[in-house]
């Protein structure tokens, strides 16, 4: 469907390529599924694939980050977005912090530099940077891309000058009007409710016509 509708850039986001960490933070995908999805996308002709990773996840140090970066280097994506871990209020980690008291949350210059060097080896350069609240190590998120593959959309949405059409449960559509007025249109979060109310979710976006 994506190829049929001429989608030219997609994201396949592992967050980490360490299965132990994925299980710990409640992510339901596996490392193998990430690799399979990437190879499938390549075989279908997608030539601008971004991958997001998070540095500073619980229990991860230089060795774990190296494992993730080596896996990404083998896959050879066109963009990599390196996120410094930020604890969000609604995330599993924030809601169950008592379960993680014995686990360290680390992000350091050394770890960030290892990620940076991998991106350089892949022929990428940094093209955008932004920060969030509660970020590990007081670092920032950095987008890297090969020549001609930068996700300009990322910059536009961070500057809030680009309308966004969101599909699916929990999606948040954003409409930017002339003069800078912004209107958000939220989809319901529960998947079953979204399916049951799909016509309503569509009607909410009539403002985009």
Model-found features: residue ranges?
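A C-terminal junction/extension of Radical SAM enzymes
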Residues: 90-167
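Context-gated lysine
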Residues: 3-4, 20, 28, 88, ...
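Short, glycine-/Ser/Thr-/acidic-enriched flexible segments
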Residues: 56, 134, 170-173
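Conserved non-cysteine loop/helix-boundary elements of the Radical SAM core domain that shape
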Residues: 1-115
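Radical SAM enzyme core and accessory elements
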Residues: 143-209
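Detector for Asparagine
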Residues: 13, 18, 48-50, 134, ...
């Amino acid at each position: 469907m994506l190829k049929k509708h001429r989608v030219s850039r997609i994201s396949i986001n592992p967050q980490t390529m360490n299965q132990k960490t994925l299980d710990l933070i409640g992510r339901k995908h596996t490392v193998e599924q990430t690799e399979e999805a990437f190879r499938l996308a390549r075989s279908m002709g997608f030539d601008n694939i971004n991958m997001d990773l998070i540095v500073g996840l619980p229990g991860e140090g230089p060795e774990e980050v190296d494992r993730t970066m080596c896996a990404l280097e083998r896959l050879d994506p066109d963009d990599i977005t390196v996120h410094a871990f930020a604890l969000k209020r609604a995330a599993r980690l924030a809601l169950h912090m008592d379960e993680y008291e014995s686990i360290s949350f680390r992000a350091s210059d050394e770890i960030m530099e290892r990620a940076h060097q991998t991106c350089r080896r892949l022929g990428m350069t940094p093209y955008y940077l932004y920060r969030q609240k509660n970020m590990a190590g007081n670092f920032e998120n950095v987008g890297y891309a090969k020549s001609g593959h930068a996700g300009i959309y990322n910059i536009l949405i961070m500057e809030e000058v680009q309308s966004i059409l969101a599909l699916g449960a929990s999606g948040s559509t954003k409409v930017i009007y002339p003069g800078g007025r912004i209107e958000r249109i939220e989809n319901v979060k529960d998947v079953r409710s979204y399916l049951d109310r799909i016509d309503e979710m569509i009607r909410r976006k009539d403002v985009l016509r």
